C-alpha cells in the first residue's frame, strides 16, 4: 500500500512540476 502511495505522490509532483 505504501508503495502505491509513493507512486501517486510522484505522479502528482511530476504533473505539477511539469
Swiss-Prot record:
Its principal location?
Answer: secreted
**What domain of life does the UniProt record list for this protein's source?**
Eukaryota
Q: Which organism is it from?
A: Scolopendra angulata (Barbados giant red centipede)
Tissues of expression: Expressed by the venom gland.
Query: What is any one of the record's Gene Ontology cellular component terms?
Result: extracellular region
Family, according to the entry, reads as follows: Belongs to the scolopendra toxin 3 family.
Q: What protein does this entry describe?
A: Scolopendra 5920.47 Da toxin
Keywords, A to Z? Neurotoxin, Secreted, Toxin
Where found? Secreted
Q: Which GO terms describe its molecular function?
A: toxin activity
Lineage of the source organism? Answer: Eukaryota, Metazoa, Ecdysozoa, Arthropoda, Myriapoda
Amino acid at each position: 500500500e505504501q508503495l502505491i502511495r509513493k507512486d501517486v505522490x510522484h505522479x502528482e509532483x511530476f504533473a505539477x512540476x511539469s
